[in-house]
Amino acid sequence: MVTIRSGSIVILVLLAVSFLALVANGEDKTIKVKKVRGNKVCTQGWECSWWSKYCCNQTISDYFQVYQFEQLFSKRNTPIAHAVGFWDYQSFITAAALFEPLGFGTTGGKLMGQKEMAAFLGHVASKTSCGYGVATGGPLAWGLCYNREMSPMQSYCDESWKFKYPCSPGAEYYGRGALPIYWNFNYGAAGEALKADLLNHPEYIEQNATLAFQAAIWRWMTPIKRAQPSAHDIFVGNWKPTKNDTLSKRGPTFGSTMNVLYGEYTCGQGSIDPMNNIISHYLYFLDLMGIGREDAGPNDELSCAEQKPFNPSTVPSSSSS
């Protein structure tokens, strides 16, 4: 017969209590997300190192609210705007949910998520703005004024892609969306990623705000070329520059997000207006989101004025124009 002494029982009880205390303190690695009065309770820090229902990762809607979206794009539904009633907060959040598990707005903690929102939406605003110097509310308040190119000069059909992304008869691949995409090969690639027939129906992007935001986030998250980083990986610090990148003055900075998206249209040409306009939107959005532009870094990290372009244009650009 096995005899258990009272001292052993006390030790076992203490061990059990200690284990429960560890679980309560968050040292159990399988704690589920709890909610108290509708708010998430996380005992392991802001986020876990993987995406799981057992982790405490916040989503974009946890820190980016509808009132902030309205502040950033306050003039988008004024009568003179060209996409009145098209863009809205819920369409953005629905689109973003597809990419949150891939790190969009959920990489590196809450502050990094907020900064990425300001950066991404700063790009969006600068590319869809109808603001000008004396516009009501200032030139930075007019983002999401457009959802399409108003007077396209061509159909943007590149026949060199006819075997992989052939142009559909009658289709026109002019700029559409929140980060406007151009050319048949871009519509084809985006359509494959988003499971939408954009090659045959590029007009879907100007008809559906969620799809338009998804196409923009896809462009932000996806390298234009396999050997290159995405704008997302540059901004959040996932990308490690090579020696050639360093010599070309490219680094994990906001400036390099402009470079990888727009190349020589914006970068490597000194302090030009297209570049400064994007920077101004980013800083303005940081201020409106309550972060402050001092967190944006020095000017040489914001600028791409002296960077060599990632993709010099010898053929139609595969990036947004």
Swiss-Prot record:
Residues 297-321 are annotated as: Disordered. GO terms for cellular component: apoplast; Golgi apparatus. Mostly expressed in seedlings shoots and roots, stems, and flowers, and, to a lower extent, in flowers, mature leaves and roots. Residues 1-26 form the signal peptide. Keywords: Developmental protein, Disulfide bond, Ethylene signaling pathway, Glycoprotein, Secreted, Signal. InterPro entries: Glyco_hydro_19 (IPR016283), Glyco_hydro_19_cat (IPR000726), Lysozyme-like_dom_sf (IPR023346). GO terms for molecular function: polysaccharide binding. Disulfide bonds join C42-C55, C157-C167, C267-C304. Residues 310-321 have a biased composition (Polar residues). One of its GO terms (biological process) is cell wall macromolecule catabolic process. Glycans are attached at N57, N208, N244. Pfam families: Glyco_hydro_19 (PF00182). It is found in: Secreted. No chitinase activity. Essential for normal plant growth and development. Regulates cell expansion extent and differentiation at least in roots and hypocotyls. Prevents lignin accumulation in the pith. May modulate ethylene-mediated regulation during development. Probably required to establish thermotolerance acclimation. Plays a role for controlled anisotropic cell expansion in the regulation of waving during root gravitropism and thigmotropism. Involved in the root system architecture adaptation to multiple environmental conditions such as nitrate. Belongs to the glycosyl hydrolase 19 family. This is Chitinase-like protein 1.
